[in-house]
């Protein structure tokens, strides 16, 4: 075997051993080689399976298939027999194709980014009963297997002795439940060693060396039971103290249960009775101390009364027990001069040292700095520059790649108009604030406050300060509801369009009903079908019922239909249940994140695309379904794009599965070519000709141009309603106010104009008014976001005003930041908007941009979310499904390589991936929870720290987009109410205060209304919390409270969001992120706004006018090294840190002069 083949063979052994360790807990390369040898001796998969079972290897069928496939893919090709094992898995792409340009590009990318082309593995998560029924079923199964192995051990033939020897050596490293004999032998060894050493000890000493046995393994470290003590003495070896060199993703990589080890005591916490140990400072063969200088330093005592060590430097700083509890008694740590004064008083006998706990806590230990984590000294931390092993040399290459262009022409007229629109919006906001301030000052001038102060007989309550009266006037002024909103609210509450037709007549009146027979024939003849139908044609509500009536729900199968939004899944399920004549959850149900309304009777199931993706994690073949419908596929969410690739392979493995992809836009040809050129079934909609008009010159202020166009249509055009597309709530509210004032100025000389806003924050009863017809002789104008492009069908619209902009979120992988920016729409969106005018009759579309801009500055189709969003959660799900080769995964539009590299780096930093890019045990736990990886890590860590009760509430509140209600007309009053719940150090704890107070008030809606909190959001948070508690119970995670020890909560947050850390830069007046050194700012709505917090973590970064940090909390920088020792490190005190290198020395100058006025180059030279 030459060197290359030998390296390939070693890689194969490592992969197989990793799979065995993840599946059984056994870490043994010899066992892996033995299984590879069995595979080589087998002619097919069945023979290989029988050989393994005959040797006592009781593995699941899917696990053996995975091992077989790994051997076939990685083993040197010359060594694999031509008729070797076939694991039964079909190729996702079917027949092989000739290399084309796309294949050449993929080969080039595979060379550049080998970390993105790791071989796939079989989905082992689906074999874990924890995901389908109960987490304890797996443990019971393992226990049964262990008993069977012990009973059959003595009756095996001689040829099995090799494997038996391996098992007997390794059973001690799995868990106590696998073998009682191994535990007895370990105990016997320890007793014999104790008796040979002499008398038993009472307690360990600091920096002492002891032998012990590993008694427990957790994600954060290993527990060791020390030998030679009268009472059982346990200590914790943190994961950072196990191995001297290299990074450990999990302690099980270096130690195993029952393993004898040598440890060194590095810290003793007498109050909490906890001992911190270290293995890396002890030679594990001889027991020799590798750091003896530490012991000598600890023995040097001072000659003073308090016996302070002369060299009390903490050489083990940062290695703190994760289970350590923080005291929150609010005591202030004494400064050095105060301590010196107390020492002198105690030495003179004036006071007793025992009466001063601060003095005792700080100086009655051998290492004061270690006991007090809240040191006053300035802590400098740095990033570790080591790259993950599987991404070595790839991270810097990815940063040089150009990102996906969200804007086609950055210098075009549309881009300039978008930037100008932001400036004008800020100007309008400042004008409103100045007007409110001016009116409050005018109210002040009408009152004479001096009279009540001069009159000695006046009531003290009448004596007011000018600032209080000014604030009260401003609150009263802003608390008044605008006239346009009052006109909207004064109307009768509506719950949608009323009809006198029966349910049957309504169904038969839909366009899809006429094509029922043709549609069912197309489904029966084709496995995959693309369905093209306009919004309102009935495709979402009717085709599921047609399929159920045709018999596709027989044999206990279901019809699944995905929706891009959870609100759509709930509302459609309720409508279909009403048409079927059942309750939601019976024959018709829905499943969204944290809510499942299905039962054994369910035949039609609506769900979000993310929930179907999680079902693919458990059951890749989707055996419960006979038909899968991907509805609203044109929206191209991240989950929908992932489902495209997954289901494209599933239909090849399941010929009986039907796949229907629906779209409301004209891009069905692309879907058809992607899904093996499947046929397209078109449902003709109600469409009429639309006249499209462009502007001759680009508009500088698109908002003002839109409002002028609305008034022009209202005054000069015929009857018909108007639909205006704007970008967000602020623009819509401003437009409604301006239109109302203009129509009010014209008085009764013009017909009535009903102004109706539509955006997600509005109550549903107000949104429903858009479906009601306009009053006789009047006209309604609907001002909406892009939700009205495809998701809504409004009758009576004859005129559409399209400024050509949309607000969308874009992820920057370099900064790890989401930017909410206004961008030009695509040509497909422009066509969709103009089509809204031709649903009822011939209409007109006013495009407020030039025809040249439409052709040259707009992209043909919108950028899919998968190319502009953070992919950490998506890649974690794909890894859990066994999909490691991200470059060869069949994406319709592949995401940028730098976005995938950034996601892999993030998962590696969270310890969800190991050095080979495969899932760790912690990563598998994180995949169990339907939330972002950071939140999953925070929740798992909170269980270990004992604050999971509070963390569940915080995570539930974070899952709601925004719980605060801040109407523009009552902003100051809303801010005043919000300040009642503020925690001065944390937005996260502020959310916890809101939830706790809401529960104390019995979840009252009136309480929410009084405190400007969205009751619907609070109820949603409560539902999320209940579902999370069910998941915690399923996986046997305890839910415990930390009481008043709120530092534990902040530390748990650090464990997941340590990459989102920023430090205050006093020179530039902002914060700098530690990872990228990018300037970011505190959002004005946060409790830390205007405060001098030094170190903070943030939940997310959103770019609007600036890069703002949202949901921020203060942290101790030492926690960062403790929770992420492989990501952060303390800066070398003997060298200048990178942070200090970036600091600038700014000289003092006259504050009345301009900056840099002191420079010689800025001085004007006088003439002679």
From Swiss-Prot:
Binding site residues for ATP: 533-540
Compositionally biased tracts (Low complexity): 84-94, 184-197
Ranges where the S1 motif domain occurs: 207-280
Any one GO molecular function term: ATP hydrolysis activity
Domain Helicase C-terminal as annotated: residue spans: 702-882
Biased amino acid composition, Basic and acidic residues: 149-173
Motif (DEAH box): 631-634
Its EC number(s): 3.6.4.13
UniProt enzyme class: hydrolase
Gene3D superfamilies registered for this protein in UniProt: 1.20.120.1080, Nucleic acid-binding proteins, P-loop containing nucleotide triphosphate hydrolases
Annotated GO biological process: mRNA cis splicing, via spliceosome; mRNA splicing, via spliceosome; spliceosomal complex disassembly
Signal peptide interval: none
Top-level taxon in the UniProt lineage: Eukaryota
Domain Helicase ATP-binding: from-to ranges: 520-684
Catalytic activity: ATP + H2O = ADP + phosphate + H(+)
Entry keyword annotation includes 4Fe-4S: no
Annotated function: Acts late in the splicing of pre-mRNA. Required for the splicing of introns with a branch nucleotide to 3'-splice site distance greater or equal to 15. Mediates the release of the spliced mRNA from spliceosomes.
Quaternary structure note: Belongs to the 40S cdc5-associated complex (or cwf complex), a spliceosome sub-complex reminiscent of a late-stage spliceosome composed of the U2, U5 and U6 snRNAs and at least brr2, cdc5, cwf2/prp3, cwf3/syf1, cwf4/syf3, cwf5/ecm2, spp42/cwf6, cwf7/spf27, cwf8, cwf9, cwf10, cwf11, cwf12, prp45/cwf13, cwf14, cwf15, cwf16, cwf17, cwf18, cwf19, cwf20, cwf21, cwf22, cwf23, cwf24, cwf25, cwf26, cyp7/cwf27, cwf28, cwf29/ist3, lea1, msl1, prp5/cwf1, prp10, prp12/sap130, prp17, prp22, sap61, sap62, sap114, sap145, slu7, smb1, smd1, smd3, smf1, smg1 and syf2.
PANTHER family according to UniProt: ATP-DEPENDENT RNA HELICASE (PTHR18934), ATP-DEPENDENT RNA HELICASE DHX8 (PTHR18934:SF85)
Family label: Belongs to the DEAD box helicase family. DEAH subfamily. DDX8/PRP22 sub-subfamily.
Protein name: Pre-mRNA-splicing factor ATP-dependent RNA helicase prp22
Source species: Schizosaccharomyces pombe (strain 972 / ATCC 24843)
Lineage: Eukaryota, Fungi, Dikarya, Ascomycota, Taphrinomycotina
Gene that this sequence comes from: prp22
